[in-house]
Amino acid sequence: MDNPFSKFTNSRTIQADLSLLEENYIPDSFPHREKQINDMVTILSSIMRNSRPSNIIVYGKTGTGKTSTTKYVTRMLQEATSNVEVIYVNCEIYDSPYSILVYVANFAGGEKIPELGWPVDRIYREAVDRINGTGKFFVIVLDEMDRLIKKSGGDSLYVLLKLMTDVENVKVSMIGITNDTTLLENLDSRIKSRLNQESIVFPPYNATEIRDIIASRLEKVFGPGVVDDTAINLCAAIGAQEHGDARKAIDLMRIAIEIAIRENRLKVTEKEVYEARDKYEMNVMHEAINTLPIHSKIVLLSAIVTQEIEPNSVITGEIYENYRRICEDLGFTPLTPRRISDLLTELSDYGLIVVDERNMGKYGRTRGFSVVKEIETIKKYLMEDENLSMFKTSKMTKQARFDS
């Protein structure tokens, strides 16, 4: 029997190092980000003169190169001097004063501090002492800083800014990365007065710029002629339509190449890109639904039920009534109507439902909702949650066509 893997090592298949297209890959060049790199280097160069640099706030939408550029510049800084430590903090994971202080203190060295159990003031003193003991500059990078502030207000940021002034033997500065240009507007004066920041803006890429970025990556993946120019242009156009998202364009190209390899095709064309787009959108939807809190899933389920039972009455009140019934069937305590309205807005932000204003005559205006894409797929993904699987035995199932 022939080895079933041999077809993937055949010399006539596409050979490519797709790790160069992964999200965590940091390239050694950043087309169309020369100004942002120069601005960041100029600010951080104070470290080379033994001075503390200004704090930096990096603004830009998803896929505009904020994080990868920051990682590149800080890596270059560490190559230029051994007297600096860079702490990269993912604020999706570390989103409270306690968790950030523990992470920073443990990074600075010494016996590992437990993630729970210590008073915050003790951890704070430990972090200050440990950083002081290194004798080095510290640059703390807060990626997705908006999550930190929305979760804990300005408390976490205030603690870090206070830490910067309380260390005596070393100098600490911060780089905050966010896609929210209004993030700092509502912070109180005690934080704003300490922040002393300079801003660097990463504007959305246009299609031509994204094309250049993809082409520069592909040069390192394999030689010319493997990917049609039309395929590169299509990926770039799709990324440009998504508010200049180069990350999505690169992901599409990676998936298109994977499809070509699996199908034993010798070239990547528009056909593979269209297939990649469909697969990408399904993956994004699956991930979005899979990570929703349980009540958000029930609200989405309720919107589908309402739409399939009474398509002309998909309004907040009707959705809430079905939500309440489903909660009772599944053994969950319903949230308030106001909270459900907020969850509907969040589902709209995810692109899982569409919101429109409806005129109810003498009753005023209300919000209407619709689930307009891949309803059967959304049902399937929702039913993967064991907490919702009992819905298939609910009396509402047949009306909502979940019994197939």
From Swiss-Prot:
Q: Does the record's keyword annotation contain Nucleotide-binding?
A: yes
Q: Would you say which domain of life the source belongs to?
A: Archaea
Stored InterPro entries: AAA+_ATPase, AAA_22, Cdc6_C, Cdc6_lid, ORC1/CDC6, Orc1/Cdc6_arc, P-loop_NTPase, WH-like_DNA-bd_sf
Kindly give the CDD domains that the UniProt entry links to this protein: Cdc6_C
Q: What are the record keywords, sorted?
A: ATP-binding, DNA replication, Nucleotide-binding
**Segments forming a coiled coil:** none
Question: Residues that bind ATP, according to the entry?
Answer: 64-68, 205, 217
Example of a GO biological process term:
DNA replication
One function term, GO molecular function aspect: ATP binding
The reply on keyword Nucleotide-binding is: yes
- What is the role of the protein in this entry? Involved in regulation of DNA replication.
The family line of this record is: Belongs to the CDC6/cdc18 family.
Q: What is this protein called?
A: ORC1-type DNA replication protein
Give the organism the record lists: Thermoplasma volcanium (strain ATCC 51530 / DSM 4299 / JCM 9571 / NBRC 15438 / GSS1)
This protein's encoding gene:
cdc6
